[in-house]
UniProtKB/Swiss-Prot annotation:
<dbReference type="GO" id="GO:0071598">
    <property type="term" value="C:neuronal ribonucleoprotein granule"/>
</dbReference>
<dbReference type="InterPro" id="IPR011009">
    <property type="entry name" value="Kinase-like_dom_sf"/>
</dbReference>
<dbReference type="GO" id="GO:0005654">
    <property type="term" value="C:nucleoplasm"/>
</dbReference>
<keyword id="KW-0547">Nucleotide-binding</keyword>
<dbReference type="GO" id="GO:0030424">
    <property type="term" value="C:axon"/>
</dbReference>
<dbReference type="GO" id="GO:0045948">
    <property type="term" value="P:positive regulation of translational initiation"/>
</dbReference>
<protein>
    <recommendedName>
        <fullName>Serine/threonine-protein kinase Kist</fullName>
        <ecNumber>2.7.11.1</ecNumber>
    </recommendedName>
</protein>
<feature type="binding site">
    <location>
        <begin position="29"/>
        <end position="37"/>
    </location>
    <ligand>
        <name>ATP</name>
    </ligand>
</feature>
<dbReference type="GO" id="GO:0032839">
    <property type="term" value="C:dendrite cytoplasm"/>
</dbReference>
<dbReference type="InterPro" id="IPR034371">
    <property type="entry name" value="UHMK1_RRM"/>
</dbReference>
<dbReference type="GO" id="GO:0005634">
    <property type="term" value="C:nucleus"/>
</dbReference>
<keyword id="KW-0067">ATP-binding</keyword>
<keyword id="KW-0418">Kinase</keyword>
<dbReference type="Pfam" id="PF00076">
    <property type="entry name" value="RRM_1"/>
</dbReference>
<dbReference type="InterPro" id="IPR012677">
    <property type="entry name" value="Nucleotide-bd_a/b_plait_sf"/>
</dbReference>
<dbReference type="GO" id="GO:0004674">
    <property type="term" value="F:protein serine/threonine kinase activity"/>
</dbReference>
<feature type="domain" description="Protein kinase">
    <location>
        <begin position="23"/>
        <end position="303"/>
    </location>
</feature>
Length: 419
């Protein structure tokens, strides 16, 4: 969908018009060499979810930078328009152009607004690593996305933690940033991938390009599997591996280094069966791209058959439309029907201050005994409630508010959360 052009000064205005609607620019989310991303919300449509405005070619950009921005815009637009509809790929709402002056157009993509990135999750879990539940969730979602885009003939070519984001509404991880993507067999990008997540064949190709030499072969979808293997190893270890994967020790025997990482973690938590994850990661990190496991085959790994449960930290970090309140009801309330109904009504009334409540559940038996599960109409209301209810006093006790997987809640599956 293309929108009409509109005037925009050097600084982002509070409002802009696109697609026949007025949009409020609320804040800048981030910026790079060729684009900036802003949080925007459609005015006059109460309850509409916010969006992400990716603006290419910021004011003052000229020359090679301007060409790179235009190229990145065209690449990302083409890829997203062809790959639309997959739940693990960011949704493109539309495309429009802003004119800072008659000769300086700024291309814009309006995208769905996502939540926390894997990069942020790695910072939170530094040194201790992510839970197996989170690693499994992320691995499955990214592999589903890769299997789809590889089937469509695309290579993402810049898979890294910052480009994998959580969707609170869809309760899954999604891929973003297709500015370096290309059609397999038609690699029109010389320099691909980010340092630390770059496959050996891409590293060689980049070195040759810097020397002004042409590579004999093009990179394939296997480069994406290498990047994912490094990301999963970082999530498991809690360590950045940029220097490790560039070391001579890694090049000599990466398998032994992976074994050492898993062995050291096994000492900390021997109860977790991690060998299936280890084998999956190894299958993604063969130096020979021809031996690397394809995404579709990786989804058949026995690692995905293990029913891991989330840690409480996972349910704090990953927003969903469902809120779980702890430390609210004790046994006295649960065993007295009148008091139980009164306190449940009080809790519901308090929760409705943050948005429409679809359902509310307070189990009287385990699992979940005494916990309050609140399903909101959308994740935005749930996030607002979680932020404001955490630490509140209720009947003399501090409330602890976490999120809870909507899919599990709908099935009546109440996890025994790991602490």
């Amino acid at each position: 969908m293309a929108g009409s052009g509109c005037a925009w000064g050097a600084e982002p205005p509070r409002f802009l018009e696109a697609f026949g609607r007025l949009w409020q620019v609320q804040s800048r989310l981030g910026s790079g060499s060729s684009a900036s991303v802003y949080r925007v919300r459609c005015c006059g449509t109460p309850g509409s979810p916010p969006g992400a405005l990716k603006q290419f070619l910021p004011p003052g950009t000229t020359g090679a930078a301007a060409s790179a921005a235009e190229y990145g815009f065209r690449k990302e637009r083409a890829a997203l328009e062809q790959l639309q509809g997959h739940r693990n790929i960011v949704t493109l709402y539309g495309v429009f152009t802003i004119h800072f002056s008659p000769n300086v157009p700024s291309r814009c993509l309006l995208l769905e607004l996502l939540d926390v990135s894997v990069s942020e999750l790695l910072l939170y879990s530094s040194h201790q690593g992510c839970s197996m539940w989170m690693i499994q969730h992320c691995a499955r979602d990214v592999l589903e996305a890769l299997a789809f885009l590889h089937h469509e003939g695309y290579v993402h070519a810049d898979l890294k933690p910052r480009n994998i984001l959580w969707s609170a509404e869809n309760e899954c991880f999604k891929l973003i940033d297709f500015g370096l993507s290309f059609k397999e067999g038609n690699q029109d990008v010389k320099y691909i991938q980010t340092d630390g997540y770059r496959a050996p064949e891409a590293e060689l190709q980049n070195c040759l390009a810097q020397a002004g030499l042409q590579s004999d072969t093009e990179c394939t979808s296997a480069v994406d599997l290498w990047s994912l293997g490094i990301i999963l190893l970082e999530m498991f270890s809690g360590m950045k591996l940029k220097h490790t994967v560039r070391s001579q020790e890694w090049k000599a025997n990466s398998s032994a280094i992976i074994d050492h990482i898993f062995a050291s973690k096994a000492v900390v938590n021997a109860a977790i069966p991690a060998y299936h994850l280890r084998d999956l990661i190894k299958s993604m990190l063969h130096d020979d791209p021809g031996r690397r496991i394809p995404a579709e085959m990786a989804l058949c790994s026995p690692f995905f058959s293990i029913p891991f449960a989330p840690h409480i930290e996972d349910l704090v970090m990953l927003p969903t439309p469902v809120l779980r309140l702890l430390n609210v009801l004790d046994d006295d309330y649960l065993e007295n029907e009148d008091e139980y109904e009164d306190v449940v009504e009080d809790v519901k009334e308090e929760c409705q201050k943050y948005g429409p409540v679809v359902s509310l559940l307070v189990p009287k038996e385990n699992p979940g005994r005494g916990q309050v599960f609140v399903e909101y109409a959308n994740a935005g209301d749930s996030k607002a409630a979680q932020k404001l209810l955490t630490g509140r006093m209720f009947d003399g006790k501090f409330v602890v508010a976490t999120f809870y997987p909507l899919s599990a809640y709908k099935r009546g599956y109440l996890y025994q959360t790991l602490l």
